[in-house]
Amino acid sequence: MRGHQIVPEFGKRVTDVLKSMLRPALLPAPGKSFIVYDWSSIEARVTPWLSMDGDDTLQVFREGRDIYVAVAARMFNLAEADVTDEQRQLGKVAVLACGFAGGVGAFAAMGRVYGVHLPEHEAKRTVDLWRKANPWAVPFWSDLEQSYTRAIRNPGEVFTAGRVQYMKQGDHLWYALPSGRVLCYPYARFEEDGVSYAKASW
């Protein structure tokens, strides 16, 4: 089948279409089953843990509380019992959009998924409230940026940010996770607008 036959005229990139076709293409052996699952609130768990400075957020999970209510309560300076459904939804969108250094654009995109539509100035205010309620976030993002920048400039040396490490070897930037897995950013280099690396869409 040719690419133009599977990609609608005004649709997605070929790589996005192929990615969405991967799971349906996998078939279990006879008598076996695949189990598909999703980590609960993984976005809210992983970045504070990686930062080594997000214990307040992680404590919400330890106590079995609703993370989106807890975040909204911190954002709007309320008791958790006083958080409305609308405020919880804002907290949810903020958690999903902002944890990986997302800003107003990420908030707006995630808001569309969950039916939250705010004017730009309100979206910015909400992002700012999330960042203030999660003091581990901005310093961790800064540490990550400094670490990968220094790694690119100093090949062969290891630089740490929270629980992760960066090292440039040859043309590639390597990102070591606490699990022992290593991600590769091929041909990482500096460009005028920041760091660039080879992506599947190239």
Describe the role of every protein-language-model region.
Residues M1-W202:
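Conserved catalytic core of nucleotide polymerization and phosphodiester-bond processing enzymes
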